[in-house]
């Protein structure tokens, strides 16, 4: 089976569902409403308009006179506007910035489904084994779990759609600068696995560099996860030896150095802002009952935004069912399950503990 069908399904399913939501909510051109919400209305739309003018007229990329009495534009660009997709504004007609932002939001949701499906197909070797009678979900060679190739491929597509339509995307799709990292994260993780397993650094370096350039804030969280996933994945592929550590450190630093063109001037600006005075919490606190977090993975939960709220964990009720199946699956050895389950528990604690939350953010 070719990749095209499952990848197309992974792109089209969230795309169609998002369009149906737009029709239901009467979002233009299906009505007279728009997606402008909170900061998207007060900040992002004016910022996108300013970027469009600079791209079309060749204005200064370093400073803007249209923000108050004048303000630095580099740090604003680095956080809000650095997505490569935003450069499509140069082709977009003036006066239709809101429509551009709507299209961009929907496009990134669909692309998230595609990239996550591609990751699953590569991670579980679905595409490589599709020419055989069955695709193999490789745990260990002696205890491989076999699925028909078409089932494995389209199961990956459904998981990709669940990722694209998860509660986080439902809550923050209007935060356009964050969703690029949702698109790129699966590629970064796949690149890391190729780096460890096959000594192929290209995808890891390029995807991580673009991720950091697109939005350094979410990229911080991705980089923390990469350290954890590297340790876990390396323990499962020790044949790669300790040189994998050197490769991981080198190409991670190289990607960070690539992003430094925006990070360094932004760090200077942030050092002069009020946020620079925020310090590590002195006492440990728990935001809410950890057991109650399970409810955030259930059907029909409300999404939350803001600084103090329940985490948006829902990505389909079937995900919880699959977690229980994974725990009780005898084909997967406990020496492989325990580190992965420990990582899930660590995430669970991070959502509720103020110190871990501070580190992630």
Which role fits each region the language model picked out?
Residues 1-27, 247:
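Start-transfer (signal-anchor) and selected internal transmembrane alpha helices
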Residues 24-123, 155-186, 214, 301-306:
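Active-site lumenal/periplasmic loops and adjacent helix-entry segments of GT-C-fold
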Residues 14-21, 322-326, 343-350:
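Hydrophobic core segments of alpha-helical transmembrane domains in multi-pass membrane transport
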Residues 38, 42-53, 78, 84, ...:
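Periplasmic/ER-lumenal interhelical loops and adjacent helix-loop junctions
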Residues 17-29, 262, 349-354:
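Alpha-helical transmembrane segments of multi-pass membrane proteins
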Residues 125-152:
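Intrinsically disordered, low-complexity terminal tails and inter-domain linkers enriched
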Residues 22-24, 121-124, 191-197, 230-239, ...:
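Structural signal for the C-terminal ends of transmembrane alpha-helices
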Residues 14-18, 106-122, 145-148, 152-235, ...:
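Membrane-embedded helix bundles of polyisoprenyl
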């Amino acid at each position: 089976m070719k990749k095209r069908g499952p990848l197309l399904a992974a792109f089209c399913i969230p795309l169609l569902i998002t369009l149906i939501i737009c029709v239901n909510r009467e979002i233009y051109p299906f009505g007279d409403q728009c997606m402008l919400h909170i900061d998207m209305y007060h900040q992002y739309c004016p910022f996108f308009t300013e970027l469009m003018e600079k791209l079309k007229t060749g204005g200064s990329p370093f400073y803007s006179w249209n923000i108050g009495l004048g303000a630095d534009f580099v740090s604003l660009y680095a956080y809000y506007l650095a997505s490569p997709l935003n450069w499509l504004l140069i082709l977009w007609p003036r006066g239709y910035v809101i429509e551009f932002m709507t299209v961009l939001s929907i496009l990134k949701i669909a692309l998230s489904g595609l990239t996550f499906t591609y990751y699953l197909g590569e991670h579980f070797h679905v595409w490589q084994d599709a020419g055989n009678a069955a695709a193999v979900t490789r745990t260990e060679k002696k205890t491989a779990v076999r699925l028909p190739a078409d089932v494995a491929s389209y199961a990956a597509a459904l998981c990709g759609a669940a990722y694209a339509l998860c509660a986080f995307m439902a809550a923050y799709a209007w935060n356009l600068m964050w969703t690029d990292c949702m698109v790129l994260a699966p590629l970064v993780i796949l690149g890391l696995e190729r780096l460890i397993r096959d000594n192929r650094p290209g995808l890891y370096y390029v995807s991580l560099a673009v991720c950091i350039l697109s939005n350094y804030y979410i990229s911080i969280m991705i980089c923390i996860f990469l350290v954890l996933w590297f340790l876990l994945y390396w323990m499962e592929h020790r044949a790669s030896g300790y040189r994998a550590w050197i490769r991981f450190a080198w190409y991670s630093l190289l990607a960070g150095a690539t992003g430094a063109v925006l990070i360094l001037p932004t760090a200077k600006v942030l050092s002069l802002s009020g946020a620079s005075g925020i310090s590590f919490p002195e006492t440990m606190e728990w935001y809410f009952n950890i057991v109650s977090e399970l409810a955030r993975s259930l059907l029909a939960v409300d999404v939350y935004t803001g600084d103090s709220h329940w985490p948006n964990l829902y990505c389909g009720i079937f995900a919880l069912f699959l977690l229980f199946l994974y725990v009780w699956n005898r084909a997967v050895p406990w020496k492989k399950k325990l580190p992965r389950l420990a990582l899930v528990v660590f995430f669970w604690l991070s959502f509720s503990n103020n110190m871990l939350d501070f580190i992630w953010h």
